[in-house]
Amino acid sequence: MSRYRIMGKGRVDHSAPVSFTFDGKTYQGLRGDTVASALLANGVHLMGRSFKYHRPRGAVTAGSEEPNALIGTSRGPIASGGRFEPNTRATVQELRDGLVTESQNKWPNLAFDLGAVNDRAYMLFSAGFYYKTFMWPKSFWDKVYEPVIRGAAGLGRSPTEPDPDHYASRYLHTDVLIIGAGAAGIAAALAAAQSGADVTLVDENPEMGGSLLSDPAVQIDGQPAWDWIEAQMRRLRAAGVRLMTRTTAIGYYHQNMVGLCQRLTDHLDTPPRQCPARTDVAGPRGTGRAGAGCAGKAAGL
């Protein structure tokens, strides 16, 4: 695992190994890894297959914009179904001990996917080919063509059991809502708080700092980036700024309503039974109310 890592880099705890499985094989990662970073650290680059032609795909980003590394995740055996969640981005899902994951859109397995024959026969599969191809005999549509086409559609498979987790929602009232806790977002939050405003700062990542977290060589005000972030976090807390990590802004609606979704337990090895898995919060922004609630992308306001 360590031979693929750059020692001294990354926001991971080398003293805290974490075990997880991917497609039935057990791997070791570190506390602070995502599934994608842990797989890469183990030399695993193939994480999925493309939708139509089943071409091999690996991670190409480090966040919620990831288009390729979509996996199924579960707290228990995948077959149990209840806590199975498809189409989770491997670049976002934090590693937790005992996490069970699987690749998607392949058969019988990821390395040898029979669906890849579509790539060889790509000339037969032009855009919208199914609207013109499966016309005859008419009696085949319901019993042959449609079941095959529906079976090939989509990437992940749906859960088979009711979701055992529970979720919470609430309204949050704030004067200023800042989405994205990079250097600009942190500075804006501090300035607003010093003016006497009630401030909420949200970010989709487990830690605030944005791109500064991946570039510790940067200096701000004569301090290394990581030291500057820690100092600003102390100042923000002292100023009473509401800090929400793992929080995604999902929409900006009428009357300054912003919807947020906050992941509360997805990263915990054993979440408390009474704790909701996620919180969704909404309310107008700028008039004293704001929405807050699960993952979070950086876009400074």
Residue ranges, per PLM feature:
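Short, glycine-/Ser/Thr-/acidic-enriched flexible segments
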Residues: 34-35, 76, 184, 206-207, ...
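Short coil/turn connectors at secondary-structure junctions
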Residues: 14-17, 30, 65-68, 172-173, ...
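Beta1-alpha1 glycine-rich phosphate/pyrophosphate-binding loop at the start
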Residues: 174-235, 239, 248
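Signature of N-terminal electron-transfer/Fe-S-associated modules in redox systems
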Residues: 1-155, 163, 291
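FAD-binding core/adjacent interface of flavoenzyme oxidoreductases
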Residues: 55-60, 97, 103-179, 226-301
